[in-house]
Amino acid sequence: MEEKITDETVSEELRSIRDIVKDLSKPVAKRHLRTRKQGGQQIEYISWYDAIKYLDHYAPGWCYEIRRVDSIGGKLILTIRLSVPCQEGIVFREATGQEDEMHDKFGDSSSNAESMALRRAAAKFGLGLSLYEK
């Protein structure tokens, strides 16, 4: 049975990083998965707004900041730091996201790169890693 992810947190008290990672590493509920075509294949992914729901639920008090913005070879590259408060202190992970500066897809370059960076940083805490086991 899938656990329902709500806006409510699992606990008001700080949790151990081990418990947070354990919960974020659970398979993402099917209703939170999206699909897109990439490299001739259909891939499943979690949207940035669903990633936020999981972080709010399992890692209350989390935050992120954009640490760096670069433009390299026509690509906008953002580096973010995702910070999670826990019993051990504040644990952070950094990740990058990129997007073509001139693209014709949904959204704009900076929003798309930021979304990718946030999801990648959350994956370093376990969120969505089960999607790569297929």
Describe the residue ranges of each PLM region.
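Positively charged, aromatic-enriched nucleic acid-contacting surfaces
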Residues: 46-134
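N-terminal, Lys/Arg- and Ser/Thr-rich interaction peptides
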Residues: 1-43
